[in-house]
């Protein structure tokens, strides 16, 4: 399982197929431990100052084992970037699991809170990954990839569930989600003090979300209702 034989910048952001909401793409085992050690070092002391020897020492392994799993330092960097993307996609998955059927305003509020936590700490400071991305000069490219994979997750797994219970009032659903996520990132950069309520209104108006509460479907209702009940309102996810 040597990881450095792939293209060293980024794998294609669009897969041939999407992922299930239970699927994780994080590295595990020794390769995952090495990647996490590198991530910690990059965030503490910077990428340029971190050597493969440093990564091996942090992970408690030999340099030979690092090179067994990763062709070179660039491959380690790629793995860390992949892990950052996974952070963002998993935050969407966790948010989806926490939603209550019919509580559109509550779901949207939780969505905005998830967005803030993904990028900023409790004091409003950027997460350490932002510094790593800026040092690498990869902020814009990373944003494109992260938005694509996040919207892929939403589009493949959540949009149809919203449409099962709501009238969809927008076209180009996938593209509108890209606009919303890029827009939220830019809006918070311009105005870090903007309230969650204002961000919620931006999402609601842009996606034309139906904010009326819904009652849970009765047991034994339409086929598949049990599977989609929890995610039916899909606030913050996007109608189609």
Where are the model-predicted features located?
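Short, basic, alpha-helical segments at the C-terminal edge of helix-turn-helix-like DNA-binding modules
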Residues: 82-88
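Helix-turn-helix
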Residues: 29, 33, 37, 41-75, ...
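Hydrophobic alpha-helical segments that form the core
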Residues: 168-190, 197-210
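Amphipathic alpha-helical packing segments from all-alpha helical-bundle domains
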Residues: 89-93, 139-167, 171-175, 201
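Amphipathic alpha-helical segments used for helix-helix packing
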Residues: 110, 114-145, 186
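Hydrophobic alpha-helical connector segments
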Residues: 79, 93-123, 177, 200
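N-terminal intrinsically disordered/low-complexity leader segments
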Residues: 1-29, 216-240
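Amphipathic alpha-helical interaction segments
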Residues: 33, 75, 106, 110, ...
């Amino acid at each position: 399982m040597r990881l450095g034989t792939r293209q060293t910048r980024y794998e294609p952001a669009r897969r041939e197929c999407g992922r299930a909401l239970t699927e994780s793409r994080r590295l595990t085992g020794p390769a995952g431990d090495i990647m996490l050690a590198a991530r910690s070092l990059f965030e503490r002391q910077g990428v340029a100052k971190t050597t493969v020897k440093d990564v091996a020492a942090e992970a408690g392994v030999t340099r030979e084992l690092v090179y067994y799993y990763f062709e070179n330092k660039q491959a380690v960097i790629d793995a860390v970037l992949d892990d950052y993307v996974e952070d963002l996609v998993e935050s969407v998955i966790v948010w989806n699991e926490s939603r209550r059927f019919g509580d559109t305003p509550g779901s949207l509020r939780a969505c905005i809170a998830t967005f803030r936590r993904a990028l900023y700490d409790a004091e409003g400071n950027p997460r350490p990954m932002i510094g790593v991305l800026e040092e690498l000069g990869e902020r814009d490219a990373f944003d494109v990839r992260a938005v694509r994979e996040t919207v892929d997750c939403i589009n493949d797994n959540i949009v149809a569930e919203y449409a099962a219970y709501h009238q969809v009032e927008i076209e180009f659903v996938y593209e509108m989600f890209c606009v919303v996520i890029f827009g939220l990132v830019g809006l918070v950069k311009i105005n870090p003090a903007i309230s969650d309520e204002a961000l919620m209104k931006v999402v609601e108006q842009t996606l034309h979300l139906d904010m009326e509460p819904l009652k849970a479907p009765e047991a034994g209702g339409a086929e598949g209702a049990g599977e989609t009940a929890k995610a039916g309102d899909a606030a913050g996810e996007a109608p189609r």
